[in-house]
Design a protein with these regions (language model features):
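Beta-strand-centric surfaces of beta-sandwich/beta-rich domains
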Residues: 2-143
Length: 143
């Protein structure tokens, strides 16, 4: 499972949303993270609030916040946009029949008016049915 997400936040704290993963037929989350920043491995608000007091991009092998858009990077200030990713390679999430993930829109300041977009991928080693062969280069040429 891989998750890539984009977030357009207002000028309040947005990092406390809890990530929950439901595996197969679970009614309660099998995996439960305590905050958005924890799930994306950028704890303490994606920066150093003691010295820097601003968001910082970071890129790791399996997680990161690779882009911040907006003129003001100060914590909880302005209309910033963030792009984050998390690959579950070192900590794969195995499931048999189904997988569902939720990400709460929470913070410790005021009501939330954020916009989230996300895309999740999953990989399997064997297809459940034979796949059609890919078209040849000649077949791919537009006519």
């Amino acid at each position: 499972v891989t998750l890539a997400t984009g977030m357009n936040g207002n000028n309040t704290c947005w990092v406390e949303g809890e990530a929950r993963m439901y595996i197969d037929d679970d009614k309660y989350p099998s995996i439960h993270y305590t905050g958005t920043e924890d799930y994306f491995c950028g704890s303490y608000g994606f920066g150093n609030d003691v010295q820097i007091k601003s968001y910082q991009t970071y890129s790791g092998l399996y997680s990161g916040m690779y882009a911040i858009y907006g003129d003001n990077r100060a914590f909880y200030n302005g209309q910033q946009r963030f792009l984050l990713y998390r690959f579950h390679v070192a900590d794969p999430i195995h499931f048999e029949t189904g997988f569902r993930m939720t990400l709460d829109n929470m913070g410790w300041t005021g009501p939330r008016y954020d916009d989230y977009t996300s895309c999740a991928y999953w990989y399997q080693t064997l297809p459940s049915a034979p796949l059609k062969p890919l078209p040849s280069d000649k077949e791919m040429i537009m006519k």
